[in-house]
Amino acid sequence: MEISDSETSVLAENLEILLLISDVGVNHDSAIFIKTKEFTFLNQNDCKVFDRLAEIEEDIDFYSVQFSGATRHPPSFLTSPRRKERLSHEKTIKKLDNVVKGIKELNPKNYLPAAGPAVFPFLDENLSYGKGNIFIHQDYLKEYLEQHNI
C-alpha cells in the first residue's frame, strides 16, 4: 500500500493514519498522525514539517518530536572549539524553539520527547554529555520548556 502525503488512510475500522512527507533537498522523511477511538498520536520524530502542523485539525493526545541534535555538524567538523560551541548553541535554540512552537500550536495533552540524546560510546565522551554541543539531554529540554510556560 502506498500512502500519499497529506491524505488520510483508513487502515481498519478503528485506525486512520495521515502522513506528512518532507522530500526537500537532503531531507527525505515523514511524520505520522495516528487516530484511533482511544487516542490520537502525532509522531514527528526528526521530520522537519513544523510549517505544516496546522494541517492536523484533530485534538492530539500524544505528540512526539526530536529535541536533541542528531548530526555530526558542528561537533565533528574542523573548526575552533569556540565556533563549534556557538554553532551548537544556535542550532540547539532553533530546534528547541521549533519544539515549543509545535507544542503551542498543537496543544497536545502529552508531549513525549524523542530522538535524544545521542550516545557515542567510541567517540569523545563530551559528545555524549551534551555540554557545548547539539546533543542536549532531557534536563536542558525541561528547563527550556519551563521557561516558555510549557
Language model features: what each stretch is:
Residues R52-E146:
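Cap/insert and terminal regions of metallo-dependent hydrolase folds
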Residues E2-R72:
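Core dinuclear metal-dependent hydrolase active-site scaffold
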